[in-house]
Design a protein with these regions (language model features):
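Long amphipathic alpha-helical segments with strong coiled-coil/leucine-zipper propensity
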Residues: 45-126
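Leu/Val/Ala/Ile-rich N-terminal alpha-helices, chiefly Sec-type signal peptides and the beginnings
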Residues: 1-74
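Charged, amphipathic alpha-helical oligomerization/scaffolding segments
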Residues: 11, 15-18, 22, 86, ...
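Beta-strand-enriched cores of mature, soluble protein domains
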Residues: 37-47, 146-151, 156, 181
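Charged/polar positions within long, soluble alpha-helices
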Residues: 21, 25-28, 96, 100-103, ...
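Structured alpha-helical bundle/scaffold domains in large eukaryotic membrane-trafficking regulators
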Residues: 28-35, 154, 187-194
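A mid-sequence, solvent-exposed acidic-amphipathic segment
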Residues: 125-165
């Protein structure tokens, strides 16, 4: 089913929110749902979609994100999701700065293509530890060099775990992918308030479409 522009924006926002929610979850608890993680990381490799739904496995990859958008914008449940919102704002700011640095964007695109080729040759899933490690290094070498850097808060025992830090960086890359899509769809932060009703209605329609 073809989505309208507002519904596409709602889907991109869900992808962004879900990725940032998982960043917070890994940093605080060391855990992330495998299905939610897969939905986020797979989106990184969908660089030439026919439609927005393709980026998120026909929308099924961001079910959690759609629910989170309802909680945050619909119920104004800000306090419970404060860290997620903080990361969302940080990623949107980072994505804007990346767009102003074409060389980094080209390096990011080339790196994603190389990792995708490695995946295909070795038949690896997006959540394979080797793939996550490669995504983590790509983030460090590209987006991670842009100042000011996104600061992650969490439990030190989880942040000291190498695999957790790799998952966090890979998820930040997934968040950037959704932020790029949000910008391409002419998404603006002001729409969260001024266009909140339209976004929520679109979010609800998309949720029903993929259910």
């Amino acid at each position: 089913m073809k989505l309208n522009k507002t519904e596409e924006r709602a889907l991109a926002l869900a992808g962004l929110v879900q990725s940032c929610y998982l960043v917070a979850s890994v940093a605080r608890t060391g855990m992330a749902s495998q299905d939610n993680l897969t939905g986020c990381l797979e989106s990184i490799f969908v660089t030439n979609p026919n439609e927005t739904l393709d980026v998120y496995k026909d929308g099924h990859g961001v079910r959690k994100g759609l629910r989170l958008v309802t909680e945050i914008l619909g119920e104004l449940n800000i306090s419970e999701h404060r860290e997620t919102i903080h990361y969302v704002l940080g990623v949107l700011s980072l994505e804007r700065r990346l767009r102003q640095t074409p060389k980094l964007m080209r390096s990011l695109g080339a790196g994603i293509s190389a990792i995708q080729e490695h995946r295909h040759l070795n038949e690896l899933s997006a959540t394979d530890e080797d793939v996550i490690s490669r995504l983590s290094r790509l983030y460090e070498d590209t987006a991670g060099t842009v100042q000011p850097r996104i600061r992650i808060q969490g439990q030190q025992k989880h942040l000291a775990n190498t695999m957790n830090t790799s998952r966090i960086r890979a998820l930040l890359l997934a968040a950037i992918r959704s932020a790029v899509l949000w910008s391409q769809l002419e998404g603006r932060r002001s729409q969260w308030l001024l266009g909140r009703g339209k976004l929520l209605s679109a979010n609800s329609r998309v949720s029903k479409i993929i259910s």
